[in-house]
């Protein structure tokens, strides 16, 4: 009887967990300072008024307001936060 013994170990069979990237707050949504708007690798989106960019390219709000996405130079997509007018006064 032919038997196969002591086969080599496989080098496959592992995977890394997803990094949970993407847009977290969409156009028109209200944000407060510190809210993460986009998690990304590289600069798929660029910061404009009312937002900042972290060292891992995360775009976050720096002011209260509503998120807007718009195209700019070199066909880049910019994200800004436009302050909402205080209607309470």
From Swiss-Prot:
Keywords: Ribonucleoprotein, Ribosomal protein. It holds the Pfam family Ribosomal_L27. InterPro entries: Ribosomal_bL27. GO terms for biological process: translation. One of its GO terms (cellular component) is cytosolic large ribosomal subunit. Residues 1-21 are annotated as: Disordered. One of its GO terms (molecular function) is structural constituent of ribosome. It comes from the Bacteria. The keyword Ubl conjugation does not apply. The keyword Phosphoprotein does not apply. NCBIfam families: L27 (TIGR00062). PANTHER family: LARGE RIBOSOMAL SUBUNIT PROTEIN BL27M (PTHR15893:SF0), RIBOSOMAL PROTEIN L27 (PTHR15893). Belongs to the bacterial ribosomal protein bL27 family. This is Large ribosomal subunit protein bL27. It comes from Roseobacter denitrificans (strain ATCC 33942 / OCh 114).
């Amino acid at each position: 009887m032919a038997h196969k013994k002591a086969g080599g170990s496989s080098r496959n069979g592992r995977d890394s967990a997803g990094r949970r990237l993407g847009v977290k707050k969409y156009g028109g949504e209200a944000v407060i300072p510190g809210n993460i708007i986009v998690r990304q690798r590289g600069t798929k989106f660029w910061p404009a008024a009312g937002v900042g960019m972290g060292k891992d390219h995360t775009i976050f709000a720096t002011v209260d307001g509503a998120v807007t996405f718009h195209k700019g130079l070199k066909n880049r997509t910019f994200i800004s936060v436009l302050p909402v007018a205080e209607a309470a006064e």
